UniProtKB/Swiss-Prot annotation:
Keywords for the protein's UniProt record, in alphabetical order: Kelch repeat, Repeat
Superkingdom to which the source organism belongs: Eukaryota
BACK domain sequence ranges: 158-236
Keyword S-adenosyl-L-methionine found: no
Full protein name: Kelch repeat-containing protein kel-10
GO cellular component: Cul3-RING ubiquitin ligase complex; cytoplasm
Record lineage: Eukaryota, Metazoa, Ecdysozoa, Nematoda, Chromadorea
Gene (UniProt): kel-10
GO MF: ubiquitin-like ligase-substrate adaptor activity
BTB domain: residues covered: 51-118
Keyword Glycoprotein: no
Gene Ontology biological-process entries: proteasome-mediated ubiquitin-dependent protein catabolic process
Organism from which the protein derives: Caenorhabditis elegans
Extent of the Kelch repeats: 265-315, 316-362, 368-414, 416-462, 464-510, 512-558
Amino acid sequence: MDISDISASQLATSPPPITTIDFNSSIEESPAKRVKFAPELTKSFEETLSPTVTLVLRNNEETFDRCLLSFYSNYFRVLFSSKFRDSKSTTHRIRLISAPDLHLLLTIPKAFEQGIKPNISLQKAVELLEPSAFLQMSIPLDYITDVICANLTHENIIKIFRLALLYHTTLAVRVWRAMVRKFQTLFATNVYLTLKENELIGLLTDKHLNLKSADEKTVVVNWIKHNSPLQSDRMAQFAQRNFSRQPQPDATKYEVIRTRQPMDAIVCFGGWASRGVAQNIEVFNTRSDRWQTCNFNYDIPNIRRAYHGIEVVEDKLIVYGGFNGTQQFQTTVLFDLSTKEWRSGANMNDKRCYVTSARINDSHGRPLIFACGGMNGVSRLKTAEMYDYRADQWSEVANMAQMRSDGAVVTIDNKIVVIGGFDGRNIHQGGEVYDPVLDLWHPLSSNMRTRRTGCTAVSIMNQVCMIIGGFNGNRRLDSAEIYDMREGLWHPVPSLHTARSNFSACQMDTCSIYVAGGFDGQATTKESERLDLRSKMWQALPDMSEAKSALRMVTLSDHPFLDELFDIPDDTGIITTW
C-alpha cells in the first residue's frame, strides 16, 4: 500500500480516543522481567494449552509458537492468557496482516536483541504501522515510528500525519511537531494548500510554528482562495478575528495570529561586564532579530563565569574553567536541559581561564570535549586535556607545540584546530592541528595574514576555518580570514563593522555567522552583527542588554528548553472558540 493510495474516507481528522492500546503501551516492562516471564508463560502453555496456534492470515494460514507471539505482542498475551472462550482455540483469524509481514514484525525485536539494527523501507514501515499497532507490538511499533519520522518530507508529511492519527498517537504527535518545523517549506512549495481547515487552524495557533511573520497573512489568504467558501468559512472568521489583534512583540511590522517562539536561538552565558562577571543570561530571538534577557531561575554554583569553556552535549550544558574576578577555575558543572538538574563534574587537571575548547566524536560516536591551553593564574599553558562526560573523566592528551591563551579553536573533519593566542610574551600568527587518533599536534601549513589573540573561529561546511577579529599587539581588529584545510592557504573576507577582541561567535545555520560583545579598544561593547555567507556582507544587529566581553554563546535548535528561556505563554484564548 502506498501512502498516496489512502482515501479520504480512511483518514481521521482528530486524534483517536484513548484505547486499551494507549493504556497498555504506557506500561513499560524491563527486559529482565520479560525474560523471566517467558519460561513461566511457556510452562503455563504446556500445562493448559497447545504450544502452537494456527493463524489464518491475509494470504494463507500458518502455525506459530504461542509463547513467541505472547512474548512480543500484548494482544496475543491477553488473548492466550485470558478466560475468554477463544483463548484455548487452536485457530485464530487475523486478516489485516500477511504471514511474511508477521514474520518481519517478529524479526525486528530479535534483531535488536542480537545487537543488529533492522533495515526496512519507508513504504514497508507504513504498511506495518496498522498491524503492529493492532497487535500491540511495542518494540516493532517504536522502530516503525522512528523509520517513518526519519523519512518525512514536505511531500508525504500531511498524508502520514492523517494515517498516524488512525493508528498511533505517539507517531501523530511526532509528525505534527515535524510539520510545525517544516511549515516554511510547506508554504514555499504550496503543499500547505492541501491541509484541512482544522489542521491549518491548529498549526497557526501553535506558538512553535516555523513561519516568517511576513508570510503569515499570505498563508491564510491563499488557502482561502484555493478552497471553496463552504470549506473555508470558519478559516475566514478565524483570520478576521485574530489578525485584528494588537501588534505582537515578535513581528511589529506584520499582521500575525500570535506571538511565536523561534525554532532556533543563540544563548549567551557568562562574560565580563562593568561590575564583574555578567549575571544576566541573554537569548537572541532569530524571529525578531533582537536580544532579550531571559529568566534562568536555577541556583547553580559558579555557572556564571568569564573566559570559560562551554559546550552542549546530549542535552547537557557543560561549563568548565574560566575566571570570576578572584580565582581561576578548575571545576566542571553540568546542567541537564531536560530534567533541569545540575551536578558537579570531575575537575580538570589544570586550572584554566582564557581557555579554548571544542568537541569531537570518537570512532564509536562518543562525544569528547577538548580544553586547550589557557592560563592557570601563574603561567600560560601548552597542555591540553579531553573530557568524556559519560565517564565524567578528564584525561591529558599530547601537549601543543606552543603555550597559548586567548586563542581560537574550531573542529574541522573531526580534528581540533587551534589558532593564534598569546604565550605571555608573543602573539601567535600560526596554528596547530590535533589528530585524536594519533594523539599528535602538527602545525598548519601556513600562517594567518596577521597575528591574533582574543580572536574567535567558526567552522564552515566542516572544511573551512574562519577566524574573526582579535588583537595584534597594537590595536583591535575588524578583519577576518578563512583557511581551507584542503588548500592550506589563508584568504581575506569582509571586515566587521566593529573592531573587537575577546568576543563570541557562532554559526546558526549554513548561511549565517553571529558575533556579539567583546572589547573594541576603548570599552566593552554590547554591539552584535551577522555575516550572510551568501552575500558576503555583515549586517548590524540590535545591541545586547549589557556590554560584556569574554562571553560564550551556544546555539539551541528545536529544543524544549527554549520554552523556558522565551517564556511565551500558550495563548489558549485564540482557540477556545474553535
